[in-house]
């Protein structure tokens, strides 16, 4: 049936057969040619036609995929300013010309060189900074190990730490861990100092490491002084040291006399202070009385002024009433005058009308 239908249909040449076609439309032209040849050749089975159509569809899909991939690669190269490939399988000539016109090769090379230089600078700077940090940390650890190595009574610091860890482990089985206040404060101080040393920017130069060593020695000396001061205060807090010194040879009597004199002077000063306080209270009372008197006088003046204002307001109201009454009377008189004038005009008009017929009869 299919072959009969194909043989019955008349095929004609297309108007667009002479035009050039891109790679994307090759499959369509091949399909058109296939239909043209199939129309000419009346012999052929339906199975061969179906297989040809399927193969053409597969080729078309494959070409479309290749074209999409090539376009995506070109867009990536344009976005990252890379040199595009010289030849691509499914790319059209127009797209390649557009790419070559938009992105010149010299600009691409210059951009690539700039990126390489920046990358090298960044990596070198990071490497130098990491090296300086590592050197500083190693020196600090070495100085701390030196200072802590000179332990008290010939016991090194590592053994002390091990003993403390053992005690803590033994205590943790029976009781909760208790950290002394000194150790806690020292740990906090050391942590803060390490953070301060790490945080600032690392200067460059040969004298930098000498400065770091000086800072470390200063910090260690300050810590030793603090420990010494705490030990001294604890030793003085013991009952062995009495606050009252044992003075002899009449020094106690002299001190007692001086104390008595100072007590007498204090009593005199207290009496003077009490007198001044009494005087201050009297002055305060007088000032309060004066304030009351002034306030009363001001209130009286204000009351008189208010009374005068009330009287003036009442007079004003009376005058306004009189003015309103007079104005009403004036309006009434004006209306009366207008009425009289109108009557007068009417009367005069009547007289003139009477005179006119008399004159006519006389003539």
UniProtKB/Swiss-Prot annotation:
Stretch list, region Disordered: 17-79, 147-182
GO biological process: signal transduction
Major localization class: Golgi
InterPro entries in the cross-refs: GKAP1
Ranges of Basic residues composition bias in the record: 160-170
Coiled-coil annotated residue ranges, if any: 50-79, 249-298, 328-348
Superkingdom in the source lineage: Eukaryota
Compartment(s): Golgi apparatus
Primary role: May play a role in the regulation of insulin-dependent IRS1 tyrosine phosphorylation in adipocytes.
Family according to the record: Belongs to the GKAP1 family.
Protein name: G kinase-anchoring protein 1-B
Source organism (scientific name): Xenopus laevis
